[in-house]
Amino acid sequence: AFAIWDTNKKKLFLARDRLGVKPLFYCSMNGDLMFSSEIKSILQLEEIERKLNFNALSQFLTYAYTIDGQTLFENIYELLPGQKLIYSFDDRTFKISNYWELNLRKSNDSESLTIEKLEKYLKKSIKLRLESDAPVGALLSGGLDSSLMVAMLSEMTDEPVKTFTTGFGHELDEYREAKIVSDHCNTDHTEIELSYKKLTNALPNIL
């Protein structure tokens, strides 16, 4: 995600990466536009009220994500992956549009070639994430997708990968499966058990 100010045209150009790896939030009030890679930065402004967006909360509790760029705070929105925002300083308005959309097409490749390509692209993707300016970790559920990512990640790093598994204290937890993968890949593994009490106690700090 990035922002560019065009001095000649007096326009601000914001864009978020195609897959939404990096976040970008914005808020428009009285013709002014505030933006940041973190919501907490926008909340530091005195004119911003910390009001809960109940519609977004309902979406999150139903789908585990919010829709149409809404966040859990009223009047603060998320620029969606592959979107750009152009703000005009002269008339103090902005427009949002898509600069990229996923182009799906049918492939005639053989199964073996598809597997070969998949491995290549997965390794390339993981390598890009290793260039992060923050410590790299992985959520490990014990399922096929996260186990595959952790296995590949472990082969590409010198230090043990930090992995995390969450559970809720019942028989459906995937601690056992995740531990098997962790032991096999020699990761620095952490198990986190969530409970209703822990979640309700943490809610005031989250909000």
Q: For each predicted feature, which ranges?
A:
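Residue-level signal for inorganic ion chemistry
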Residues: F2, L85, S182
